[in-house]
Amino acid sequence: MHALPRYAVFGNPAAHSKSPQIHQQFALQEGVDIEYGRICADIGGFAQAVSTFFETGGCGANVTVPFKQEAFHLADEHSDRALAAGAVNTLVWLEDGRIRGDNTDGIGLANDITQVKNIAIEGKTILLLGAGGAVRGVIPVLKEHRPARIVIANRTRAKAEELARLFGIEAVPMADVNGGFDIIINGTSGGLSGQLPAVSPKIFRDCRLAYDMVYREAAKPFLDFARQSGAKKTADGLGMLVGQAAASYALWRGFKPDIRPVIEHMKAL
């Protein structure tokens, strides 16, 4: 039996995850000791790994790529956010032995933009680049903030149109995107290999915030491009990472961490 409350992040790979450091900072704020580990589940072995974790005393888990859709199907019940996103990044062990799935990615993004970067989403025009799981996961919460308009652009138009129909937003081909957006969010994974979304530099001429959902070096190509093209402010996804983790922590423990000092702590590492 484990003496400390036990949590973990599941992914493949998982060794790079910053979640253990982030959650230990939250535990310091709460004044408690927790155990938080990384679990690299085999492809095809995720459900068994999660089952074993909870059966041996696990209290809650984060889920990262490539298991967010599988986590959705594994959960016994879902939050409205998870249902809308069709993906789960947080698993909560309930007292009756069932597992509840939630998605805190959108909360992390929206809180970083509105509370840390101090830019309101309400009434603004938003451009989302990419149409994968990362983008789908944040649209429901962005819509809750009542922007004037959300447009999604993707390399393959069909995927963008599918999300546009699902969420009642607009879709355009990347090559056809022009300016007129207050907030531009990059949800493509191109930065991981140094690639930029195939968009014109003109899209940044009215941009108040260019945001990349990945962080550190992976965000650099897009943010440099945005800055050089006229974006007034740029930000990587570290605040989103800390914010979604804080929302997960609150679901597990009923304690709401202050994300600002943790963002600064993670920047210094």
Curated annotation (Swiss-Prot):
PANTHER family: BIFUNCTIONAL 3-DEHYDROQUINATE DEHYDRATASE_SHIKIMATE DEHYDROGENASE, CHLOROPLASTIC, SHIKIMATE DEHYDROGENASE
Purpose of the protein: Involved in the biosynthesis of the chorismate, which leads to the biosynthesis of aromatic amino acids. Catalyzes the reversible NADPH linked reduction of 3-dehydroshikimate (DHSA) to yield shikimate (SA).
Positions of NADP(+) binding: D80, G130, A131, G132, G133, A134, N154, R155, T156, R157, A158, K159, M213, G237
Pathway where this protein functions: Metabolic intermediate biosynthesis; chorismate biosynthesis; chorismate from D-erythrose 4-phosphate and phosphoenolpyruvate: step 4/7
Subunit organization: Homodimer.
A molecular function GO annotation: NADP binding
UniProt keyword Ion transport, yes or no: no
GO cellular component, one term: cytosol
SUPFAM superfamilies to which the protein is assigned, alphabetical: Aminoacid dehydrogenase-like, N-terminal domain, NAD(P)-binding Rossmann-fold domains
Classification via InterPro entries: Aminoacid_DH-like_N_sf, NAD(P)-bd_dom_sf, SDH_C, Shikimate_DH, Shikimate_DH-bd_N, Shikimate_DH_fam, Shikm_DH/Glu-tRNA_Rdtase
Assigned EC number: 1.1.1.25
Protein name: Shikimate dehydrogenase (NADP(+))
Keywords assigned: Amino-acid biosynthesis, Aromatic amino acid biosynthesis, NADP, Oxidoreductase
Organism expressing this protein natively: Neisseria gonorrhoeae
The keyword Ion transport is assigned to this record: no
Cystine crosslinks: none
Residues that coordinate or bind shikimate: S17, K18, S19, T64, N89, D105, Y215
Gene3D superfamilies: Leucine Dehydrogenase, chain A, domain 1 (3.40.50.10860), NAD(P)-binding Rossmann-like Domain (3.40.50.720)
Family that this chain belongs to: Belongs to the shikimate dehydrogenase family.
Single GO BP term: chorismate biosynthetic process
Catalytic activity, reaction form: shikimate + NADP(+) = 3-dehydroshikimate + NADPH + H(+)
Lineage of producing organism: Bacteria, Pseudomonadati, Pseudomonadota, Betaproteobacteria, Neisseriales
Broad EC category: oxidoreductase
Catalytic residues (positions): K68 (proton acceptor)
Domain of life: Bacteria
Regions annotated as coiled coil: none
